[in-house]
């Protein structure tokens, strides 16, 4: 997970969440809604070419490819897809509150070649729980197109209700849609032990480490990767939303993964899942 900034002020990235924010810090003081957790929001500065700037940041840390949230109204995303398909591939953020969202997935798949679908159940307004039937057309389309579904689970960072993202809700989705490739993102805390138990239970359930610096990777996830979950856990960053690549990779070597876990964690698991 990575973003291509389009300007130094990225507050517009979070406008979709404004109807849910009630405290004054979140509404008017934070650069991003979970800033109380992220003390050093990356400063990207101003650049004539933010795509090239992002590629340079990737090259510093030998990142060959990155998954970007796609928006067809963004000229930067369109140009990245057109001119740098070797470096960027795309997920489509979706919202069941939008009419015909499942067909929108198909259109983006056919037109832009998206590789995945993503969602933030607690962040949409109205909120929609992971197991709500309103998601079913989207899940069905993901199965039809064989697109992985990346979903925020666990307590959300922003000060908004957590109920739609309780990890226990994933159980029903994986039971009802056994062919759906479901990837938990943004922590699954405090239910990481349950997340691991569900990954043992369901062959198409995975976990990515998005929005967490390596020193805060949950111990349950590290233990699972080192044992029965070697093919289930995959790296994801959070640049430039909340973490710099410098911070992420300065801490990475301290993660106690076994030697055989590293290549799968850093690339092989994602490459297989996303058919890269």
Where are these regions (language model features)?
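Active-site gating/metal-coordination segments in enzymes
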Residues: 64-65, 71-157, 161-164
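Alpha-helical packing segments of well-folded alpha/beta enzyme cores
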Residues: 50-57, 73, 104, 134, ...
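Catalytic pocket-lining loop regions of alpha/beta-barrel enzymes
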Residues: 115-116, 128-234
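A structural motif corresponding to the C-terminal end of an alpha-helix
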Residues: 56-64, 84, 144-145, 176-180
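Histidine-centered catalytic micro-motifs
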Residues: 1-4, 150-152
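Conserved, mostly hydrophobic/aromatic
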Residues: 58, 108, 142, 186, ...
């Amino acid at each position: 997970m990575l973003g291509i900034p389009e300007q130094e002020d990225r507050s517009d990235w979070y406008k979709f969440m404004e109807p849910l924010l009630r405290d004054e810090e979140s509404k008017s003081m934070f650069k991003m809604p979970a800033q109380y957790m992220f003390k050093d929001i990356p400063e990207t500065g101003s650049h004539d070419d933010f795509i090239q700037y992002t590629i340079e940041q990737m090259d510093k840390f030998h990142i060959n490819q990155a998954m970007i949230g796609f928006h067809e109204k963004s000229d930067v995303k369109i140009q990245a897809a057109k001119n740098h398909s070797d470096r960027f591939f795309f997920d489509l953020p979706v919202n069941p509150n939008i009419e015909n969202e499942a067909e929108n997935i198909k259109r983006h798949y056919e037109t832009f070649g998206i590789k995945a679908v993503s969602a933030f159940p607690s962040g949409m307004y109205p909120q929609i729980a992971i197991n709500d039937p309103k998601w079913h057309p989207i899940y069905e389309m993901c199965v039809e197109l064989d697109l992985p579904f990346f979903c925020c689970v666990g307590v959300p960072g922003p000060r908004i209700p957590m109920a739609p993202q309780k990890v226990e809700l994933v159980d029903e989705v994986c039971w009802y849609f056994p062919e759906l490739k479901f990837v938990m993102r943004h922590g699954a805390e405090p239910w990481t032990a349950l997340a691991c138990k569900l990954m043992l239970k369901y062959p198409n359930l995975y976990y990515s480490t998005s929005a967490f610096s390596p020193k805060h990777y949950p111990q349950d996830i590290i233990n699972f990767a080192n044992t029965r979950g070697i093919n289930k856990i995959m790296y994801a960053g959070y640049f430039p939303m909340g973490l710099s690549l410098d911070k992420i990779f300065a801490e990475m070597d301290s993660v106690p993964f076994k030697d055989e876990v590293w290549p799968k964690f850093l690339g092989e698991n994602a490459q297989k899942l996303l058919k890269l």
